[in-house]
C-alpha cells in the first residue's frame, strides 16, 4: 500500500481542521513548517506541540483538536498513537468542565467500543453520530453540546478500528450499530434512532438499516456504496492506506452494497454529495437515487466532504435531522438555505414499494 505524501495529507487534514473550527492562520503556519522540512515525522510532532501548548493554556477542547490532527490519518507510529490518547484525555477534561456529557463503554461481540453521550434518556429520540475512517469521536463536540436544543439523546462513537473501537473493519462491520443499540436497550431506542454517519460510516448505516428496524433515518455526507470497495487502486493513498490499516489488509470487495441491498433500505436517507469528490464517484449516489425508497440529496461543486460548503452542509443536515425529529425549526432552516442559494442541484426520489 502506498503511503500518502505530505501534500496529500495536508489537503485532507485541511478539511478536518476547518470542520473543527481551528484557526486558519495557525493551521497554515503549521502546514508550511511541516512541508518545508519534508520530514514525515514532523507531522505528528508539530501538531502535538500545538496541542500541548493549548493544554498548558487551559484550552483542552482546542488541544484535543490539534491532537486529532497529530494522529491523522491513523496511529501508524508511536507519536500518532500517543496523540490519539492525548485527544481522548483532553476531551475528557473539557467535558467534565462542561457538564452534561457522559462516557460510555460497551463490551460488544464485535469488540470494545467507547462513546460520549448527552441527554440520553428514555423517551428521547436517539441521534447516533459516527465519523468516517479518519474521524475520532472527539471531533463531534457540537452534537453533544446541542443535545438539549435538539430535544434528542446524542451518542457519538467511532467506526471499527478507529480511535478506541477495537472491532475489526470488514464484512461483518454492519453489526456494530445494531450491537450498540442492543447495549442501549429497547427503552432508550423506543423513540427512534437517527444515524448521522459520515462517509464510510454512512455506508455502515445503510448496510445495517437493511435488517435493523430500529434505525429510523440516515443522514450522510459522501458515503460509498459499491464501486469504491471493488476498485481501491482508484482511491487516494490516504484512503487506501487507512482502509488497509483498519482492515488489516483484508479484501473489502464483499462490503459493496447490491441493488437488492439498497432496495431493502426502507428508511429516509439524506445525502450530501460533492461533484468533484476524489473518493466517491457520482455513480455511488446515483445508485441510491435509483434504488433507495426514500432518498434526498444535495450536490455541491466541491471535493470530498465539501470543505468549501461547510456551513451549508451543516444547515442542510440539521434541517433534515430536525424534520425527522418532527421539529418545526426545520422549516426555518429550509428558508435560510433557500436564501443562501448555495446548495446547487440535487433531488428527491420516492421509489414505489
Feature-to-residue mapping (PLM):
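Short beta-strand/loop motif that positions the catalytic acidic residue
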Residues: 265-266, 271-273, 277
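Catalytic histidine-centered segment of alpha/beta-hydrolase-like enzymes
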Residues: 74, 302-314, 332-334
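Catalytic histidine neighborhood in serine/cysteine hydrolases
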Residues: 289-307
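Conserved alpha/beta-hydrolase
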Residues: 147-164
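Alpha/beta-hydrolase active-site loop
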Residues: 139, 167-188, 194-195, 206-207
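Short alpha-helix in the alpha/beta-hydrolase fold that links the catalytic acid
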Residues: 143, 267, 280-290, 301
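N-terminal cap/lid segment of alpha/beta-hydrolase-fold proteins
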Residues: 47, 76-120
